[in-house]
Amino acid sequence: MERALPAAGFLYWVGASTIAYLTLRASYSLFRAFQVWCVGNQAFVGPRLGEWAVVTGGTDGIGKSYAEELAKRGMKIVLISRSQDKLKEVSNNIKEKFNVETRTIAVDFSLDDIYDKIKTGLSGLEIGVLVNNVGMSYEYPEYFLEIPDLDNTIKKLININVLSICKVTRLVLPGMVERSKGVILNISSASGMLPVPLLTVYSATKAFVDFFSQCLHEEYKSKGIFVQSVLPFFVATKLAKIRKPTLDKPSAETFVKSAIKTVGLQTRTTGYVIHAIMGSINSILPRWIYFKTIMGFNKSLRNRYLKKTKKN
């Protein structure tokens, strides 16, 4: 009995220490959640970083909402997208609504010979914020070998989702480093957090965006550059083919108002509190449950799409 007492005492302190550690960890997590989602960092992004903000894919959805939010904060806006008509319309609306200067650069990011034109268009500008938003996804969930026009689709997905981020960052980052300040927001996706079968190439490109962002932040944070990977779940946009916003599928405007307050607080964010909860649930699910669920969901979307197109 006497020999058991020291062992019991040791186990008591191990248990007490474990409980104290878990309590502190939970308390810190709750504090951080309150700081990020309730308080936010509203003043981090603005003209103090530089006169201009550059937004790729800025004529629709999340990109357009970022451009409007940055203009609202007093930044001049450069929109880079494919359609000159849309660029003109959105830039004029931003100019009139927020009384800021705007510029446009019309390029097709599926091509790889566009970056000299972008370089010329950005020459001489004091760029404080870069939003790498341009992206494309599948027309519908599909098995890899059955993707229509597979070779061309692979090339376009890589050029638009991967090459564009590397090349535009290459053009903008030197000026930020020279001035020792700047923010780069790379729009990834929740599909980049965990593998998404039937969206295989898209999911892989978004995982690249996430890793690229994390690495770039570590390389350049000492130079005053903040790089954030933004990983939203569904947002009501044309790309996502969702028209009506809901609590878990916010409008692009609602999403961006939430996401921009996380800049300076999180280098990796879902951007929206409901999406943060969804991400936490996904991260603790056993992989077999996750894959069974996501395969079932995407198979259902695939079958629905193919049935609809067959009717038409």
Curated annotation (Swiss-Prot):
Q: How does it sit in the membrane?
A: Multi-pass membrane protein
Where it sits in the cell: the answer is: Endoplasmic reticulum membrane
Residues annotated as binding substrate: S189
Its domain of life?
A: Eukaryota
Which annotated residues bind NADP(+)? 50-79
The record's top EC class is oxidoreductase
What the entry lists under InterPro entries is as follows: NAD(P)-bd_dom_sf, Sc_DH/Rdtase_CS, SDR_fam, VLCFA-Steroid_DH
Family stated for the protein in its record: Belongs to the short-chain dehydrogenases/reductases (SDR) family. 17-beta-HSD 3 subfamily.
This protein is called what? Very-long-chain 3-oxoacyl-CoA reductase
**Species in which this protein is naturally found:** Rattus norvegicus (Rat)
